[in-house]
């Protein structure tokens, strides 16, 4: 990603976080077409509102259009999309686990032999500090009533997590 675009994104997120009193952070940035298409996914520990996405979009656009060293950006000749992660999107940044404590998740991980395994259960803990960040999943039995499975909670090192997706509960 172009250094100038990245700087504009980072500075804008910091500005909007202060202005809205939130803790928004960047989950993913996808810049394609030589900077003509910029897609950002943002998150906050307590969720992201449409107003925050719109404010961030306006702030980034203004910063990029004020950039005289890139004529394409200065002319506003680019597409900018700012959104929050949708339902069923995998966790991309470890900080997202904090937002989903208490929710049901499906986690694909590597066991001690390096084999892929899957567990579905409630995220009960997220320890993101220290040398080995980890999450703890309490397995649940599939069925009409959500019950614990009788299996012990499983603590996984984040380094072993291949994919984690929050499950919707209807």
From Swiss-Prot:
Keyword tags: Cytoplasm, Ribosome biogenesis
Pfam families: DUF150_C (PF17384), RimP_N (PF02576)
GO cellular component, one term: cytosol
Protein's cellular compartments: Cytoplasm
Gene Ontology terms describing biological process: ribosomal small subunit assembly; translation
Gene3D superfamilies linked to this entry: RimP-like superfamily, N-terminal
InterPro entries for this protein: Ribosome_maturation_RimP, RimP_C, RimP_N, RimP_N_sf
Keyword Oxidoreductase: no
Family note: Belongs to the RimP family.
HAMAP family: RimP
Function: Required for maturation of 30S ribosomal subunits.
Protein name as annotated: Ribosome maturation factor RimP
Gene symbol of the encoding locus: rimP
């Amino acid at each position: 990603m172009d250094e100038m675009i990245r700087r504009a994104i980072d500075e804008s997120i910091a500005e909007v976080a202060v202005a809205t009193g939130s803790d928004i952070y960047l989950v993913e940035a996808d810049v394609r077409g030589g900077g003509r298409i910029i897609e950002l996914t943002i998150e906050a520990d307590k969720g992201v509102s449409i107003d925050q996405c719109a404010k961030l979009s306006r702030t980034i656009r203004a910063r990029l259009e004020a950039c005289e060293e890139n004529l394409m950006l200065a002319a506003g000749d680019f597409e900018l999309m700012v959104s929050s992660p949708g339902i069923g999107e995998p966790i991309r940044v470890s900080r997202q686990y904090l937002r989903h404590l208490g929710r049901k998740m499906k986690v694909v991980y590597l066991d001690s032999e390096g084999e892929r395994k899957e567990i579905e259960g409630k995220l009960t803990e997220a320890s993101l500090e220290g040398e080995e960040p980890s999450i703890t999943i309490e397995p649940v039995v599939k069925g009409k009533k959500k019950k614990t499975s009788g299996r012990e909670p499983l603590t996984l090192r984040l380094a072993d997590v291949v994919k984690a997706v929050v499950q919707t509960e209807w």
